[in-house]
Every structure is written in C-alpha cells, then in structure tokens.
Amino acid sequence: MVKKRLSSSDNVFKFEIPSNSKTSAEAPHSSTDSPSSVFLSSEAENGAEDRRRVSKSPTAQSPTSSVEAESPDQKRSLGLWSKSSFDGSSLLSDKNDCKTESKTDSKTERKKSSSSSQYKANMHFHKLFLDVPTEEPLRQSFTCALQKEILYQGKLFVSENWICFHSKVFGKDTKISIPAFSVTLIKKTKTALLVPNALIIATVTDRYIFVSLLSRDSTYKLIKSVCGHLENTSVGNSPNPSSAENSFRADRPSSLPLDFNDEFSDLDGVVRQRRQDLEGYSSSGSQTPESENSRDFHVTESQTVLNVTKGETKPPRTDAHGSRAPDGKAKILPAHGQSETIGILHKMESRKCPTLHHILIVYAIIVCALIISTFYMRYRINTLEERLGTLTSIMDPHSTEQTAPSGLGSQMQLNVEVLCQELTANIVKLEKIQNNLQKLLENGD
C-alpha cells in the first residue's frame, strides 16, 4: 500500500514540471539518473518534433497547445482518484479483517465457555454420583423433573453406562442411578394435553417418569443410543409371521386322496375293446346292421360304465367334505351354544331385576303409608289429651265453688273411664302397627 501511494505522488510531481526548455537542457545531464529523467527526456524529444510540425503546419498549433494544457489537469485528477480508490479499498479491507477477527474471537470464546461448562458439569456429575467411575465422561445433561407424589425438579445426567438423576427440593436430595444395561423399556409419553414432554424409563423393579423435558426427542435418541441392548432384544424378539402360515400348511393336506387307477380300470378295458372292434370294421370295409347295433350297444355300455364310475368317484369327495363339515360345525357349535346361554342368562337377569325393583317400590309405599298413619294417630291422641285437659280445668273450679250433684259426678267418672279405655285401645293398636312395621322392614332387609 505504501509503494502505490509513493508512485502516485511521483507522477503528480512529474506533471507539475512547467517548461520544456529546462527539461531539454537538463536532459543530457540526468538521462540515466532516475525513471523521471527518462520520462523528461522523452518529453523533450516529443516537444522538438512538435515544433517542427508546427513550423510546417501553422494551422495545427492551437489544438495541440490546448491538449498539452489540458493533459496535466487530467493527470492530476486521475492521480487524486487513484489515491481515493486506494484509501477506500484499504478501509474496506481493514473493516473485513476486523469482522473476521471478531467472529473468530467470538467462536473461540464460545468454544472455551462450552468446554468449561462441560468440564464443570462433568465434575459436578462425578461429585454427586460416586458409583460412576471417574474415567467415564458425561455425555450430556438435561433439565427435567421426576414425577412422583410431587414433581422433583432437577437434572438428568447421561453417560456411556449410566443414567442418573439428581434434585434438591425442600432441602431433600434425591439421587437415582440407573445402569444402562438394566433398562428394559424407554417410551415416549406426554403428561400435558398438547406438549409431548415426558419419557418413561423402566427397569425390572422400578419405573421412572421424567417430565418437563425441553428437548424430548434428543434425550430419547441419546438414551436409546446408550441402551443398545434394547435394539438387539427388539430385533431378536420379532415374531416370525410365516410360522402360523407354515403350521396352517402343515395341517392342510397336500392333495385329495383320489385314486383313479382302480376306479377307471374297467373303463380302460371297454375303450380298448371298442378300438379293436373299430379296427376290425375298418379292415373288413363293410358294415352290416348287426355291426351297427353292436356298436350302439358298446357305446351305450361304455356310457353306463362312465356314469357308474362317476357315481363311484363322487362319494369320496362328498365324504371328505362331510367329514370336514361336522368338524367345522363341532367347532362352531360350542360358541353358538355359549352365546345362547349368555343370552338366556341376560334375559333371566333382566326379568329378575324388574321384579325386585317392583317389590322394593311396594315395600317403600307400604312403609310411607304406615308412617303417615302413625303421625295421624299421634295427632289424634294429642287432640284428645288437649280436650281432656280443658274438661278437667273446667270441672275443677265448679268442684271448689259448689259440690256437684252425685248424678253429674258419676257421669263424669264414666266419661273419664270411657276415654281411658279408648286411649288404651288406641295405644294397643299403635303398638300392633309398630310391630307390623318392624316385621315388614325386617322382611324387606
């Protein structure tokens, strides 16, 4: 950058030289001193040639002088423009260098911070869980919560051979360390309605539900990669779909037991005899009505033999189907019988339930009627007692003031006795009604 700036300043200095005579005078002395001297000598020679041309053609003097006058200004502007362009490019390059340096610095700082945080997490992990060997590094840790009677907020630590959880709630430390080889199930689930945020990790004896996972899928993938034995067991325990088909094919007969050799032996003999007869007829070349009749007889005989053989061959198939059909029916009948018995039981229960319901309703109505009657009898007894009280209150003042006649006294005594008898009779009736109610209630229970 410095060299370019110096060259541009040299060019400006060259263009500021005014006179051609001085340059022509100084040219022979400084012809080999510097590149600027070479440029000046060439300019002097060009000036001499221009003068000769001007002497030959005076009309061309004015445009050449204007061009010579304008050329220094143009060269100065070009020099300034080149300076500004060089300065702008240098500034841009400096800015780009600063940006790249800042990016690299930020990346290195991030790497340093992540490595330091990972180192701190690893140290904390080994400090909490002493069962894990110190040579085994921590792969990753996740913030989550263990779901029990309450949520225990904490961290889930995953290493190569261990899955550990630690939380401290209400001053109580809960630590769970699960060896990776003891895990029998890893399942995704969700405790919220819409957010899938939970994982189930099960062993032979325990089952843990970790909720509030921010990145459940990455956690699931990491734990799945740690528990590689689960993939092997899932592949080994995959059912063979062809086993049922093979058993079905083994139970099924390969072919139907059809023996046509014995059944169609007679038919072969008839056909051979018929061929011999036809050959004899063709050799003789003459046909008589007897031969035609015999031929018809043989044809009808062969047809009857075919019909007989068909009739004999059909029963085995029907027998085979018949022997299979009863088995199928025997297999289907128990289920049908069970369904019928279940339907009958349901009908009986549906019949029994309404009868019990009606009986309970009747008992309830009777009990209500008895309760109402007892209240009514109690009301009547209270009214009678009030009347007796009023009568006695009326009779007491008359007895104090004047003695009542003997006739009236006897009548009053009779009335009191009658009332007492009626009351005792009513009380006896009430006791009977109460006993009956108790018996009905006991029977209803």
UniProtKB/Swiss-Prot annotation:
GO cellular component, one term: cytoplasmic microtubule
Keyword Phosphoprotein among UniProt keywords: yes
Keyword Zinc set for record: no
Keyword terms: Acetylation, Phosphoprotein
Comp. bias intervals (Low complexity): 82-93
Polar residues biased stretches: 18-44, 56-68, 233-246, 281-291
Protein name in the entry: GRAM domain-containing protein 2B
Source organism of this protein record: Mus musculus
